[in-house]
Amino acid sequence: MTEITALEAVAAIEAGTLTSETLVRGYLDRIAERDDVVKAWVHLDPDQAIAQAKAADAASGGLLRGIPVGVKDIIDTYDMPTGHNSPIFEGKVPFGDAACVALCRTANAVIMGKTVTTEFANRHAGATTNPHNPAHTPGGSSSGSAAAVADGHVPLAFGTQTGGSVIRPAAYCGVVGYKPTFGDFSRVGIKMQCHSVDTLGLMARTLDDIALFRAAVLKLPIVHIDRDIGRPRIGICRSPVWDQAEPETKALIEATATLLSDKGASVVDVAFSAPFTDIIDDHAAITGFESVRNYADERLRNPDMVSEELMNGPMKRGLVVSFERYVVAQRKATAFKAYVDSLFDKVDLLLTPSAPGEAPKGLAATGDPVFNSIWTLAGTPCVTLPAGTGPDGLPLGVQLVGLRHDDDRVLSLAAWVAAHLN
């Protein structure tokens, strides 16, 4: 039952061959069986989930009718605590839902519970493990959401991305992760870290489910994946940080490019030109400057309740970024977005790593967002697809980057790639 896709489940519920209650109970059984190891959930109330499922069964219609959704614990829910993995907010229930959660409820979804996040969606890790090997990180900061989808606890889950917090954990856990064009999804009711780049993202096991989920969050009719979109023009973008990729990741990107070329795609090399070869430093300047100010209350009023890792790491670094440096970085980011847009005059997708390698061993850190931050700054839609395994038998992903505000087409092009990867 937990292997069914969200799209299939909605169709079955609408047809009367499946009930949401049956579906939700199946997922709850899976969670009871596995979450002592995976530790994906910080708040889960089975009775509340079943009550929502019964209400969905009694209702009619809705893009997500009866479908369980996991919600990262920096996203507000009026009927559940939103704790941000911080003692400052432990047990506190917001006054209302985040816009994305409210829109899911409007679509008759079941808000299953809250998934583990790193502290304030930053570096200090939570308890979640990688479902493929609990000795390894699931990635972060959307740790619980990625692990929950990968381990069959829910078919859909929300993440957020400031650096690489959707794409990287999705890749580490072997699921599909999608970061939309910056600004497409409302951020109302989501803990703000960096207002220039913070982006709500989605995780699922299939691109069809991502398309369904996207439509619900936008409150629009679903734009189904176009299976006849044709052969894409693909640019291999090793990016300025290619030297930080592990050998298995470099080999995967090269092998994927060869495979897609053999299947009929046009494949060319794409390299960054000056002055954008150090653009990752500008992402760091912008996020450092903004985050230390957006966390002002936590930092100044409750410093003893902020982790040392956050207080003496990102916050300390952010305090030394001058306003002049911030302005320079913002101006460069504006130019960079236009530059990246221009790359799509000649290609439809960029092929690039989702992460440096497979999920690192240990739970104290969640991996490096070095292959994600530049695209988050560019505001482009990004998709990670499971594409192989590394030397420890853990998932490897490939990242596909598309033109801003062309997300529906990007998802269809990604489906062409996925069909040949599989």
Please tell me what each predicted stretch does:
Residues 65-198, 239, 353-366:
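Short glycine/serine-rich loop/turn segments
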